[in-house]
Swiss-Prot record:
A motif (Nuclear localization signal) lies at residues 786-792. The gene is TARS3. Residues 3-23, 76-96 form a coiled coil. Catalyzes the attachment of threonine to tRNA(Thr) in a two-step reaction: threonine is first activated by ATP to form Thr-AMP and then transferred to the acceptor end of tRNA(Thr). Also edits incorrectly charged tRNA(Thr) via its editing domain, at the post-transfer stage. GO terms for cellular component: cytoplasm; mitochondrion; nucleus. Gene3D superfamilies: 3.10.20.30, Anticodon-binding domain, Bira Bifunctional Protein, Domain 2, Threonyl-trna Synthetase, Chain A, domain 2. Residues 157-222 form the TGS domain. Residues 106-123 have a biased composition (Basic and acidic residues). This is Threonine--tRNA ligase 2, cytoplasmic.
Amino acid sequence: MAAEALAAEAVASRLERQEEDIRWLWSEVERLRDEQLNAPYSCQAEGPCLTREVAQLRAENCDLRHRLCSLRLCLAEERSRQATLESAELEAAQEAGAQPPPSQSQDKDMKKKKMKESEADSEVKHQPIFIKERLKLFEILKKDHQLLLAIYGKKGDTSNIITVRVADGQTVQGEVWKTTPYQVAAEISQELAESTVIAKVNGELWDLDRPLEGDSSLELLTFDNEEAQAVYWHSSAHILGEAMELYYGGHLCYGPPIENGFYYDMFIEDRAVSSTELSALENICKAIIKEKQPFERLEVSKEILLEMFKYNKFKCRILNEKVNTATTTVYRCGPLIDLCKGPHVRHTGKIKTIKIFKNSSTYWEGNPEMETLQRIYGISFPDNKMMRDWEKFQEEAKNRDHRKIGKEQELFFFHDLSPGSCFFLPRGAFIYNTLTDFIREEYHKRDFTEVLSPNMYNSKLWEASGHWQHYSENMFTFEIEKDTFALKPMNCPGHCLMFAHRPRSWREMPIRFADFGVLHRNELSGTLSGLTRVRRFQQDDAHIFCTVEQIEEEIKGCLQFLQSVYSTFGFSFQLNLSTRPENFLGEIEMWNEAEKQLQNSLMDFGEPWKMNPGDGAFYGPKIDIKIKDAIGRYHQCATIQLDFQLPIRFNLTYVSKDGDDKKRPVIIHRAILGSVERMIAILSENYGGKWPFWLSPRQVMVIPVGPTCEKYALQVSSEFFEEGFMADVDLDHSCTLNKKIRNAQLAQYNFILVVGEKEKIDNAVNVRTRDNKIHGEILVTSAIDKLKNLRKTRTLNAEEAF
């Protein structure tokens, strides 16, 4: 042990000396560079030599740090073994000798301690050995990190002073490698410092307690910011991960924030998580929060991290397959140390209220051939009111769940014999067909041409389009006469074949192909969810083939199209322009021109929009559209995406005005509803099953006052049915008139038509609505005309407007 201690001290001493050498050499490099600028004709050999020497020293230092870490770890293990031996010897000696009885106060303290330990044991079932080993290594690395920080901050001259520009315009002075964003916030206002979730330094998310490394622009983000929410929920996931390790003793995998909350996946040998265990996990999380465990960040070499996480094959996979740099970061809170890019909140106490509410099983990285994992979901907020509002929202969302509405209203169902493929019953099929008819009507107004294309293609098509290389695992494939075929997951390659089947001229452009073809995607069984995630679906899919000069007008037309459709449904929407990413393909001049035209289209459209720089697809810029439903949720359905690459892949050309027969078109991928199935799910939940009249699967219920009026009721129902309305008649003799009316209202019939002897004589009906608004007696022909007009105009509040 003494030899290892001496070796560790020697390595540490050498490391510190070489850090000093690096600083001196680097200052020499700077000095020589300055001299070179002032004397350009002098010898310039020293600078490169010195920078190479600095690089060599740094490489050697990296190796020294690793050796130092290993020596310290061995030293710590040896000390731990020595302490265990000494403790065992002491216990043996105490057992051999007589011990005095404990005092009353000592006895009481012992009882309290045992009670606390038993309470903790009732929640925490396992404390794996790897936790202790992991902590030991982290502490050694932390000491090294603190030593480096001390070295960086040693100068003590004016070069240590940095300027921090806060987003509100204030300027604050600080010290490099010492001043933190939290200290800057506290200098402005302690209230601001406490309400800040995370910092943004020079555009990069930054831990509040992480020292600044130079002059900085600083933003202080609170929970109402989306990026801050993601950090808050990511930190909450670490709290859940800590609780899961203590409770289950399994191996953690991924624990990200999601749109509303967070989850953590864990591999647990030979068992599954039970929903009855979630309250126990929540209690552990609350205890962790009370401890205010600080989040500590360390940058560590990949080699050392593979040693740290050698017990966990999943973390090692991430390191080997996902980490392409020599170092990466880990974060610690309490006993948990997790491979993580961060950043995080200052300490666990910042999470004011937490709820662990759901569990499920999944596969490692979604691959059913890999290990089964247990996934646990949670949500957290900075105050109790937000949690109460969330719980209320969840109850409302539960009542609006499209699967519940679909079952109650007999719209659709799913069956194990065809997972992910919906069976639409007559009333559900009415909604489906009404939506597609609506879009077809709009197509006719906007000069779209509907086409029909095959459902399956030879794999050579997908190889040509590029989908085979990146998407084949999501396609249903099969062999026919030794060739591989696949059911189409999208329409665009087929439409490219349609464009290319004969020569095209500029006079034809733009060509707008629309297709309701059936699509299939091989979604994993665990991801299937009602109508929102299916394997078989249809889209209101269209592809516009146009010239570069026509992009602006075509985009304007697409925006007007989606506004017309979404306003009919009563949706508001958000627009985001996603521009050229770093890995873009094609000529930059074409990208610039296309992005300019997209911006012009959005400006002329007149609705608010935001820029998402670098978030476009590699093959073209796009406009992302999100609709907002009745309970405040956002859904992305529409697509407006430019594509410069498919025309190249399929060698699509047209003859231009000046006779160039090699001119490339641009493709605009465009959908408004997106998946018709998913849109039905969104509409079901948006309306809560109270469908607007034009889309309603239960538009009219005719109720006779008594048996003598039943024949007339059937006649009235038949007249409405012949005009295309979803009309029914209630002839149930076991119910009173009032009960029949109430049943029709609960079943969400938009209009209830009561007929008695008077109405029979007058050839009329007595009209009331599902909300019990009474319109009174009206002739059958007049009622039909009014309802036809309300259907034609797709009036949202038809019951009021009748």
